[in-house]
């Protein structure tokens, strides 16, 4: 069932039919059989026309032009042909008819079959939904990964976020505040006393000049009267109330609470501390103190706008001089402001009017207070009497809505703030106490469709619209009573007419202008339920405004809490996956509202009553007919029996094939048929038409000659189909086919001339294959060996001796006459192949004569490429551990196969991998290329067992010093300082979650997981990250498993000398769990290094394009040195000393952020590094050995670690060749040095090198590090031109040119694997064209690539296609040199 479902979802290919079509088989069976026969000879195939879904086959008439004698006459004739109907992608129901002559399927008017249409549409919808589901899963996986990374970065940044900074005060505010305090104190100590002079001496005017004796005279004032009333109240209270010291103290100090100076001090201090601009309030307080406005000014401030506030300042200054004039001035200022600001809008003008009235009232009230000498608390009580009635309505309300000038609610405030509860945090305590510690849900992601909204401009306002089907939809109140509105979409403006107003709903449907055909159409939600809803509208500046909330259905409306801005009415309300729910309408402050839009809201076409009655009658008849359509006739019953027998025969054939390994259809009878066909024998022609059909065609006007020609054409089509069936089933059983006539049925089912057993067995007699001379030597074992066949006990019992003699002879031939997959010199290949073929035929014929199926008739048991791993039982989680291989390991064999003598053989594991590889692919596509330049010095790597022993030499050259740090402390210290400075940006790096690491998941998952899964991607798809997480926790907890590495040799283009010497590179690959553990520690650092290639030495992650190569060479030249060095090692990875590699790894751990440098992480990382240096390696032979040297070439950070080591070596080398310099001098001169580094490749500029630099560094690397540097690999020059880096040579204009063009040619004409098609070959040559662009036009490689591209382009065009891409010189210049700055 799983296989059928999978094939149904994929497009039908050649020879593969959709499972729905195979099962349902709609239409005429004879038409179906005939249709597939015609499809084989047709120029266009049904599999290309219908990608999936059931097909309906039927016979029908087709009018064609009459052709006679090669002349087309304008007369149409009618022929009988096959009509095929189905549903294409996009839910288009189409019908195609086969047209003779052109032999192709041509589209005709559709012949609708309801069942085919219904199932076809469902299949197309299922395919689309399946594609959407896969895409959604991919996006979900990507989003989860991004969320994990962002969460990790967020947690790290939160820890690094500094605390809140202390607020600083402006100098001007501090100075003015000091002035305010001084002024306030001066005003507080100032007092006025009125009295009468008692001295008798008077001057001429009757007034004493100096009064030494006087008495105070208390004039009447409100202050004195209220003070006396207050004292009387206190005296009365003292006589009747019980004695209370606290109460006496409170009543005694009560007047001071209403004191102006205390209030001014508190207000001023609060503004200086908390306000951003306190000067405005300080100015007001100073002027209020000066003018005696005092508390009246504070009460008036909340009701003043900017003009009236300035008016208050002016009035208070005048009030201090003359109170009566100040009252007049306040009136004049208010009138002047009201006249000057007449142009304001109503809202602002109303605020100004209120401010002016407040200004005049405050001035008059201040004059009364001053005149009556009223105390401060009297002023406070008067102000409270004014304000309390205004807020009574607010006190009893639950909330306060603040509306804007347009009447819409801008803000809603809670009228019950409960400040104490809020500040105490009691509510938060309960929330924290009952909140779950683990988050159980996430906010949903939403699907937003950009550029899908239009703007509706009507007379009464503006709104939003969107497309549904072929209508524009908006809110009814946006359009109003208009019948035509203006519509804008991006830069396209058009007009739309009202088509339909939905009854009882505020929804209007408009016509869709022709210019908006590409506007996205919203699809209706299948059901409308409560849940998350999304409102998308046009925001300011054309940007999308998105609101997300929880919606609740109320009748035919939905409410949600989303604020509404101008122009949002008519916006679509959708689900999180973009399905339409309704049309947005209004905002009520707390909730938004939308009208639900359903499928029934579209205008429904009214059907004629007669048509409706007929449809009801047809439905009733079809329902009644369904009970009578099962095998109603004898032909149906016979058909059912034949179909059942066909299925049973297919099952039996498959079971027999699987059980006995029977080869498919290679019989003597079959070869007779094919031989007869090749010799020109013809079978008896069958009937094309029945007698009734033939007479009908004659009556329609066809002549006998025309019908004879049509019959011959039909028979030729049948022959083509049968030939195809013969080819397709040449290695298979004959397929089931319907009989052509009743006579065949009678003969096959009831005839008496049945073959005997002996005549049937004679069909299986082996025949000698005359053509074996083309067999390649590397294919001898595959062609003639018996190990690919199932051999039973009966075979061994009767033919064991013959089989042994045959296999011994075959092994002797292979060992004696072949070497490394090629014939030995002076070998008569023709005689050897004939001899092997004769022995093969003799063995098979002997078995046939004794009644046993020969090997020629048995199926080879070759392993197939599976989409999944081998069949197995349920997996035990312990089998996924890193050290499970130790439980599987058996003791080693007595001898050695692939392990060198100086390496131990620890044990043996069961593994089935090839050891030798002598395959040199022969790609027929290469015959399309013109003759290539000579590249015989290179070829594809091939190897035998000796190559594995040779590959271990990469770890051996010379012995390094026991302690380099101890023997060379000065050089070691300087190298460590350079390392720290060069990679200072690694400080603060982090450890990533193992599930968030990135790695090539298409790589092998090593042993033993490779027994079950081919790649890590397959392993992850089945097991997920559960094994990764559990193993990470186990190791972090203290486990230290031994890790197994799988070794294989690399298939690549090498020099022929290396291939002949079996010098092939080895690659080791560890378990993906181990790789991702290391990646968790190092991926962040690796990413940081890839982003610093422009300014730092390591170049992993760089690009030579867009002037990248030239800029880096210019960076070296900018040091203004005269020494440039091209430096390369031999066996670099394998000979890196353990001491250096351990130092590099220790440095990397020290660069982690402090919170990650825990003891547990350090111990885990140390285990990881130890496993890199002490490796248990599995050979393809099953042998397990141990490697303890070098940087493994398959670990996750091989290149990055090589870069770090290269920087260390270079700094050590620089100090070594300058022994006369101190550490400080070395640091100074190092600033003038620079390098480009990629693994073991290095291009350096030094300020100075000694004359014997090459010899000194060659001996230094050998004696100190035990590494191999060949003198010819160290090139010293005074210019970078001519030196090479990363396979490029620096050209005269500092642009890169390929260094080894012969190797590129060899990889083209002698590739390591075959290419898929001619387009892939064209693309490969195009890559060479790009690489060789900077070569001179006369260069042989560049001229060849240009010619090859043109030749391949012509071939592609001759095949009816077009070359994938055409690259011009200008484009290549831009690619290499970059665009304009």
Curated annotation (Swiss-Prot):
Keywords: ATP-binding, Coiled coil, Covalent protein-RNA linkage, Host membrane, Hydrolase, Membrane, Nucleotide-binding, Nucleotidyltransferase, Phosphoprotein, Protease, RNA-directed RNA polymerase, Serine protease, Transferase, Transmembrane, Transmembrane helix, Viral RNA replication. Residues 121-160, 703-732 form a coiled coil. The chain crosses the membrane at residues 169-189, 249-269, 279-299, 324-344, 365-385. One of its GO terms (biological process) is viral RNA genome replication. GO terms for molecular function: ATP binding; RNA binding; RNA-directed RNA polymerase activity; serine-type peptidase activity. Residues 856-879 are annotated as: Disordered. The active site is at residues 477, 506, 569. Cleaved by the viral and host proteases. The protease is probably autocatalytically cleaved. It comes from the Viruses. Residues 1122-1254 form the RdRp catalytic domain. The modification O-(5'-phospho-RNA)-tyrosine is found at residue 694. The record marks 195-196, 436-437, 662-663, 665-666, 752-753, 867-868 as: Cleavage. GO terms for cellular component: host cell membrane; membrane. Its EC number is 3.4.21.-, 2.7.7.48. It catalyses: RNA(n) + a ribonucleoside 5'-triphosphate = RNA(n+1) + diphosphate. It holds the Pfam family Trypsin_2. Belongs to the astroviridae polyprotein 1AB family. This is Non-structural polyprotein 1AB. The lineage of its organism: Viruses, Riboviria, Orthornavirae, Pisuviricota, Stelpaviricetes.
